[in-house]
Amino acid sequence: MDTKTVVNALWLYDDLLDLYGDWGNLLVLKSYFGKMNIEFNIIKKSIGDDFDLEVADFVYIGPGKFKNLCAASRDILRYKDDIKDAIESGKCFLVTGNARLMFGNSFEDTGKNLYEGLGIFDYTGHESGNVKISDVVAFPVYSETPLKSYGFINRTSYIEGN
């Protein structure tokens, strides 16, 4: 018997946080899941929309212009406890680019205006207004064995802390 499994991906702030076509991350996942006969549903939610983390197997938040990130950050705070609980229970989140700023304690713009973060990680984000482009080599903290990862950075923000 051929059983088809379903994965529900919750894409938060798809209309605001999709800089550089990061939508491609989800298309790649959809393609690979499809090859394994797993249906990959994408549920899009944005500012003012209610969402249920319980129905999502996977949550994606991409990068965006800083003003869009600020708007999304004000909205996502209403789910602060739900997001913390979901992460602590093992829910999978893929947060790319400057969207990671929302998961720290706070972040600030170039004028030093402070925005509250979700407080998942103990860091503070800063928007510099200057573009930094470079290659990066990293060793993910979640790997029990050294796992060398290569990437590319194109950013205007940075974090301080862990």
Go through the PLM ranges and name each one.
Residues 20-26, 56, 105-106, 110, ...:
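Surface-exposed loop/turn and secondary-structure junction residues enriched for glycine/proline
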Residues 14, 45-47, 62-64, 96-99, ...:
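Fold-independent oxyanion-binding glycine-rich loops
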Residues 16-19, 66-68, 125-128, 158-161:
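Short, acidic Gly/Pro/Ser/Thr-rich loop/turn segments
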Residues 66-146:
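Cysteine-nucleophile active-site neighborhood
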Residues 34-38, 88, 123, 159:
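Generic secondary-structure signature for well-ordered alpha-helical cores
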Residues 1-11, 127-162:
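Amide-donor transfer/coupling interface in amidating biosynthetic enzymes
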Residues 1-85:
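N-terminal beta1-alpha1 cap of cysteine-dependent amidohydrolase-like domains
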